[in-house]
């Protein structure tokens, strides 16, 4: 495979596209610009070692294999390392379904709005700390732990 990206990036893109292939108007995960979102989601949970473990379990020629072979490799890894596989898959889904392109496809297909879920079209007033004056004067009415 001639690709200017390094082997880890190529393997990751193949992994993403195998886990979430193109289907019914949805793009494959590896075709999108989600590696950054994927890495950020992984880092937020401190799961970099799990991703590294999964990538090391993939054969060097994983990206060059057929879709069926890649699926079989991942099924084998899922059977042997189910916790690792499940964690990585969750991060892939988080990155995929928050991608603007995927959200647009969802909106067209299902009518699910491709925007943040709350306060669409509503402007919130700037918070006024003075509105808490009365509460601050009250004695606590809860038990301290």
Show where each model-derived region lies.
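Ligand-binding pocket scaffold of soluble enzyme catalytic domains
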Residues: 1-9, 20
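Mature-region segments of soluble proteins
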Residues: 10-17, 26-29, 33-44, 48-145
